[in-house]
Amino acid sequence: MTELVFILDRSGSMAGLEADTIGGFNSMIARQKQEAGEALVSTVLFDNESVVIHDRLPLAKVPLMTEKEYFTRGCTALLDAVGGAIHHIGRIHKYARREDVPEKTLFVITTDGYENASRRYNYETVRRMIERQKEKYGWEFLFLGANIDAAKEAARFGIDADRAVNYKCDEEGTALNYEVISEAVCSVRASRPLSADWKKRIDEDVRKRGK
């Protein structure tokens, strides 16, 4: 069993990429449904606020995302989205029977800008939370950022540079993001080590086409 948590930016700066984001996410979920193994899916959409549209749904029951759920507005309360999701999943694991805790947990965080609107969590708190879950429970975190220094920003969250990547925030870059995320999810679900070149295709795209 794998715990999958997707934290997706829907702030105002994502305007124009709604259809690409929805299509990429749905394609990724469709592919994962064809893979072996069980998974629980949580999806958090964030702007000024965080909205949970899937709360630990069995993968087979995850519905298609539509424009009713994914629409752009507001600012970027990224710390609140990440901190809130870690707290929620962590508490469930803490109080669950040992045999009910998924063997693997993967968080995938995407943002096209810097944190600018969180009220509940700060960098220090979230960094400690992430480092604890990584060290104590082996959770994995991937950070995909556009229009920012993704590695530097990820480091403020306690996420290693080899788990962070800059992507080009356009139609092609968004589609590629979800292809690469899907490949990474497949590796984690199959208990294969997530190599440092998981992000190679995104890096190459940015080199070719610029940020």
How should each PLM-predicted stretch be described?
Residues 1-211:
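Acidic, low-complexity intrinsically disordered regions
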